[in-house]
Amino acid sequence: MASSLTCTGVIWALLSFLSAATSCVGFFMPYWLWGSQLGKPVSFGTFRRCSYPVHDESRQMMVMVEECGRYASFQGIPSTEWRICTIVTGLGCGLLLLVALTALMGCCVSELISRTVGRVAGGIQFLGGLLIGAGCALYPLGWDSEEVRQTCGYISGQFDLGKCEIGWAYYCTGAGAAAAMLLCTWMACFSGKKQKHYPY
């Protein structure tokens, strides 16, 4: 099977896939922020949440429903900052996935990734990582929303966790973006083989 990638390019393709997968898994999982409410663990992502309070009519009290899900609508996301974070991080993950899948195809298809295409792919990865990094930086701005304050002991604010903790998915998303920006972008410059020029 012919490949359009150098040895460095094959490593770049695998690392691109790993960094994209890491960022995408972290983005999708609702474990960016951990807290508790009514004695039950609660976690948030950018567009998903685990455990939420509902009013139990039979007992006339608030109870926690312990399940994960998306917000009912885009407007249901607790803060404008988290809505922007969802869009920006989602775009970044999409770009990283696009480049990763193209790079993996370059392992099997000859003359798909030239040096120029590799450099352009590296630029796209840098942009994707930058967008995800911007999303991660925006996320703490939403910690002053009412839903988060209920979970974090009513003492959280922008860039102030209160009684909450940052979850593994936040770190996972950021680590994937950092790997894409720092390692993959650099390796992409050396990923493609020099194009052969045919005399005809």
Swiss-Prot record:
Subcellular localization: Membrane
TM spans (from-to): 84-104, 123-143, 166-186
Record carries keyword Signal: yes
Gene Ontology CC annotation, any one: membrane
Keywords, comma-separated and alphabetical: Membrane, Signal, Transmembrane, Transmembrane helix
Record carries keyword Protein transport: no
Signal peptide residue numbers: 1-23
Disulfide bonds, paired cysteine numbers: none
Family designation: Belongs to the LHFP family.
Protein's name according to its UniProt entry: LHFPL tetraspan subfamily member 6 protein
Gene name, Swiss-Prot/TrEMBL: Lhfpl6
